[in-house]
Design a protein with these regions (language model features):
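Inter-helical loop and helix-membrane interface segments of multi-pass membrane transporters/permeases
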Residues: 1, 37-77, 104, 108, ...
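Early transmembrane hairpin of solute transport permeases
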Residues: 1-102, 110, 279-302
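Membrane-interfacial loop-to-helix junctions in multi-pass transporters
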Residues: 3-4, 111-116, 149-160, 209-213, ...
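Transmembrane alpha-helical segments in integral membrane proteins
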Residues: 6-18, 78-99, 179, 221-248, ...
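Alpha-helical transmembrane segments of multipass membrane proteins
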Residues: 35, 39, 82, 86, ...
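Aromatic-rich transmembrane-lumenal/periplasmic boundary elements in polytopic membrane proteins
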Residues: 127-195
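Individual transmembrane alpha-helix segments
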Residues: 178-181, 187-192, 203-232
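Transmembrane alpha-helical segments and their short flanking loops
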Residues: 194, 202-214, 234-242, 256-260, ...
Length: 380
């Protein structure tokens, strides 16, 4: 659920950090709601069902309204983009009203109230406008998805999948892509011995694992996540931790580092790390993005196709954890793939540790230790 509400959390946090004013935060929350209300009433109904989601329970019965639509109306998912739109209008409203003079037309209206109403109205109009633009955004990515799905055995297609998947994850759209590739025909299909058809990479893997059949046709979209969660993320955390030079800070962060590494290995914490990299170390994120894409392209060629057995909502799915991997250890069908995965994982750990250490020590020391150069200068 944290992933689902991440855009709203990001919005409220960003507004509060800039203004530290409770009324501006309230304005952002109400503007976010009005933004999705505007989308709900004007949203097209011909988009894939995966792109629609009820934000904060926002929905309406179309039969009670004067509309051509039927059923329950819900807004389409806007992810982090929607939060950024509302953030812009909330901040601009707050800043413009700071410059308001006592002689303005609406000087009799309290400034805080003006911020709230202006943010709500502008966000509502932005939501309505977005309903005319958003279908082009959706169709653009649908064309990319269709291109990728035409040949999931092609390393180039898998390379593109890796890049698109991680970029959409940052924008809070990965659940849409995952739903299509995990459980629909875009991820492939497989007919079991009794004639039942199973679709999607995760759907096929779940069925094949239940029948003790090697997932030679599935698992390729999940395998890289094992390496990233179990090896890459812990390496990044440990390397970043080692760049702290203050012994007191170093000691205080040890419990957090242990917890973060454990969470990544047991449950997967790839997304929070990626978001951190986007805002603090874009170059390091670029390295991570292309290395992830390379893993998607190379692992199937090496025979490493270890999937994720799951049948629930993609929003709560946590693929790539060591718990899922331990289930496969005793199965002789997957032992060769596990050995290769372990070897590549160890190489990945060393690579991420080296790249992260070099980046923070030589290229971006100020991000983690902003006063380190200053201190060294004064001491000398």
């Amino acid at each position: 659920m944290i992933v689902h509400y991440f855009p709203l959390i990001f919005l409220l946090r960003a507004v509060y950090r800039r203004s530290e004013d409770g009324m501006v935060v309230l304005a952002a929350l109400l503007a976010y709601i009005s933004f999705h209300v505007g989308i709900m009433f004007f949203t097209p109904t011909n988009l894939p069902t995966e792109v629609y989601t009820s934000v904060l329970g926002i929905s309406a019965n179309a039969s009670l309204l004067v509309t051509k639509n039927s059923g329950i109306l819900v807004p389409f998912h806007t992810g982090l983009i929607g939060a950024l739109v509302v953030l812009y209008f909330t901040r601009s409203s707050a800043q413009s009203l700071k410059k308001r003079t006592p002689y303005s037309v609406f000087s009799f209206v309290d400034k805080n109230v003006s911020v709230v109403f202006r943010s709500i109205i502008l966000s509502l109009l932005a939501g309505i406008l977005l309903t005319f633009i958003w279908p082009m955004f959706i169709n653009f990515f649908l064309n990319i998805f269709t291109f990728i799905s035409k040949d999931l055995n092609n390393p180039i297609n898998l390379f593109i999948y890796g890049i698109v998947n991680r970029l959409l994850s940052i924008l809070n759209f990965s659940h849409w892509m995952n739903q299509l590739f995990w459980f629909s025909n875009l991820g492939g299909s497989w007919v079991d011995p009794v004639g039942a058809v199973h679709t999607g990479d995760v759907g096929m893997w779940t069925a094949q694992l239940a029948r003790n059949i090697s997932g030679f046709t599935s698992g390729k979209l999940i395998s890289p996540l094992y390496i990233l969660n179990i090896f890459a993320v812990p390496a990044f955390i440990l390397a970043a931790f080692q760049t702290y030079t203050d012994k007191l800070v170093h000691k205080r962060l040890i419990p957090f580092v242990i917890l973060a590494v454990s969470m990544s290995i047991l449950f997967g914490t790839l997304l929070p790390i990626e978001i951190f990299l986007v805002f603090t170390a874009p170059l390091l994120f670029t390295f991570h993005l292309f290395f992830t894409a390379i893993l998607y392209a190379v692992l199937p060629m090496l025979g490493v196709t270890l999937g994720y057995s799951f049948t629930g909502n993609v929003l709560v799915g946590t693929p790539g954890s060591i718990i899922d991997l331990l289930v496969l250890i005793r199965n002789p069908i997957y032992q060769k793939a596990l050995v290769i995965l372990l070897f590549i994982g160890l190489m990945t750990f060393l690579l991420y540790y080296a790249v992260t250490s070099y980046y923070y020590r030589r290229g971006a020391i100020s991000i983690i230790n902003p006063n380190e150069k200053e201190i060294c200068f004064k001491e000398s």
